[in-house]
């Protein structure tokens, strides 16, 4: 692989593309995240058995469809999410989604570090701040090696978390006296179904919007759709189930407390640590690509800086986790909606990244994101879905009208350059 093995400033060449199996493990390493188990615990204690599965399957199906669109575009073009955003937002306009997406990934990194350090501190009596510092440093170091390191870590962590989660579910069901007893559990504090759906989608809408950053390494765009669906519909659903079963059986929403109560302290520390490590490295990798789009600096250097920032802010982010998900569920989806909408309208432009003429700032795209956020906040229904559709539809309607002359001029120039 070349020195810039992150390919942060241009398309991934065919020589650096990877097979579907390697990408599937990388994406499962992303979605097999303990945060989904924590959210699953919240749903498991707040929803009935039937409503839990309905919320998880609907929410992750929506996530799978959304990320499949973005994965297809990423694999077809070989471009990062942030370079794709230049087509719709403009070269400097793309700095806004890069800042928003890159910043949230730094936040997720901090949440992940705390999710590992706090239960280990509870169980061992070691200082939590020291654990945060050490684990944050170790997780930051490996991201320097790029997509290859993510693949190796995922090959280890994905089977391990599947085994641990499956065993925890088996203990929970047996401890209750069978599946029928688990089905009969009535939530002490019921959770609104629309809120539950927003939590499911919000749990991975930020990382899901960055699907292109990982799947762009795929050799086949159609298979990239399969990779995204497996990772988000199947992988993320399993993580919710792993978290919910023990939570419902023991009445504890915190997965670390559940694992300790089930006598799984040591394997939980090792396996959940690996699990968080893979997702956190994915988060830092993606954040580096985002800030590289803004600064032009090496994405590897920026990933290390972001790791330090996320480590310092870890405890604050962990303590505001539900609020963080609520923010993400409305603020991030319109960005992906705009990228998808522009590709559907102008897909031929994406074939010539190096020569395509782009606006400096496309204010229509920024307005569409604002309208998408408003749709998510004010319209009834599922917040992230309203936000995606609001952003995409606003862009599809407004961009051809407000940028009619600019779009026509750019199309004319590009047609002549191709000829």
From Swiss-Prot:
In Pfam terms, one family for this protein is Transp_cyt_pur
Q: Which CDD domains match?
A: SLC-NCS1sbd_CobB-like
UniProt KW keywords: Cell inner membrane, Cell membrane, Cytosine metabolism, Membrane, Transmembrane, Transmembrane helix, Transport
The record, for InterPro entries, names: CodB, Pur-cyt_permease
- Which molecular function terms from Gene Ontology are attached? cytosine transmembrane transporter activity
Instruction: List where in the cell it is found.
Output: Cell inner membrane
| Matching Gene3D superfamilies | Hydantoin permease
Q: What is its main location?
A: membrane
- Periplasmic-side stretches of the chain, per the record, are 40-51, 121-127, 173-192, 243-257, 321, 379-380
Mapped to this chain, the residue ranges on the Cytoplasmic side of the membrane are 1-19, 72-100, 148-152, 213-221, 278-300, 342-358, 401-419
Q: Which GO terms describe its biological process?
A: cytosine metabolic process
Transmembrane feature ranges: 20-39, 52-71, 101-120, 128-147, 153-172, 193-212, 222-242, 258-277, 301-320, 322-341, 359-378, 381-400
Question: Is-annotated flag, keyword Heme?
Answer: no
What is the protein's membrane topology class? Multi-pass membrane protein
Its GO CC terms are: plasma membrane
To which protein family does this belong?
Belongs to the purine-cytosine permease (2.A.39) family.
* Summary of the function given for this chain in its UniProt record: Required for cytosine transport into the cell.
What name goes with this protein? Cytosine permease
């Amino acid at each position: 692989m070349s020195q810039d093995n992150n390919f942060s400033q241009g398309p991934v060449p065919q020589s650096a593309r990877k097979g579907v199996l390697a990408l599937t493990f990388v994406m499962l390493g992303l979605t097999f995240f303990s945060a989904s188990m924590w959210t699953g615990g919240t749903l498991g204690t707040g929803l009935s058995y039937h409503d839990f599965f309905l919320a998880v399957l609907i929410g992750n199906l929506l996530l799978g469809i959304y990320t499949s669109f973005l994965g297809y575009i990423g694999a077809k073009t070989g471009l990062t999410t942030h370079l794709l955003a230049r087509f719709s937002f403009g070269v400097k306009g793309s700095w806004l989604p890069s800042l928003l997406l890159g910043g949230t990934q730094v936040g997720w990194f901090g949440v992940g570090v705390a999710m590992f350090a706090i239960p280990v501190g509870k169980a061992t009596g070691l200082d939590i701040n020291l654990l945060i510092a050490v684990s944050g440093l170790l997780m930051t170091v490996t991201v320097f090696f790029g997509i290859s390191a993510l693949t190796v870590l995922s090959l280890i962590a994905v089977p391990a978390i599947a085994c641990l989660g499956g065993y925890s579910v088996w203990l929970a069901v047996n401890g209750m006296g069978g599946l029928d007893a688990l089905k009969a559990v009535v939530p002490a504090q019921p959770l609104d179904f629309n809120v539950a759906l927003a939590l499911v989608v919000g749990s991975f809408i930020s990382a899901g919007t960055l699907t292109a950053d990982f799947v762009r390494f795929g050799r086949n765009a159609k298979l990239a759709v399969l990779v995204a669906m497996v990772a988000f519909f199947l992988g993320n659903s399993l993580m919710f189930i792993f978290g919910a079963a023990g939570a419902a059986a023991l009445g504890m929403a915190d997965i670390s407390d559940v694992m300790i109560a089930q006598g799984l302290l040591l394997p939980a520390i090792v396996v959940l640590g690996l699990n968080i490590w893979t997702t956190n490295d994915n988060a830092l990798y993606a954040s580096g690509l985002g800030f590289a789009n803004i600064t032009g600096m090496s994405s590897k250097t920026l990933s290390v800086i972001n790791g330090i920032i996320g480590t310092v802010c870890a405890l604050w982010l962990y303590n505001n986790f539900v609020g963080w998900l609520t923010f993400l569920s409305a603020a991030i989806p319109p960005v992906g909606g705009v990228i998808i909408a522009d590709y559907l309208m102008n897909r031929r432009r994406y074939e010539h990244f190096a020569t395509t003429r782009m606006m400096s700032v496309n204010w229509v795209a920024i307005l569409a994101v604002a309208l998408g956020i408003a749709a998510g906040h004010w319209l009834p229904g599922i917040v992230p879905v309203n936000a995606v559709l609001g952003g995409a539809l606003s862009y599809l309607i407004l961009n051809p009208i407000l940028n009619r002359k600019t779009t026509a001029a750019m199309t004319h120039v590009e047609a002549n350059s191709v000829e």
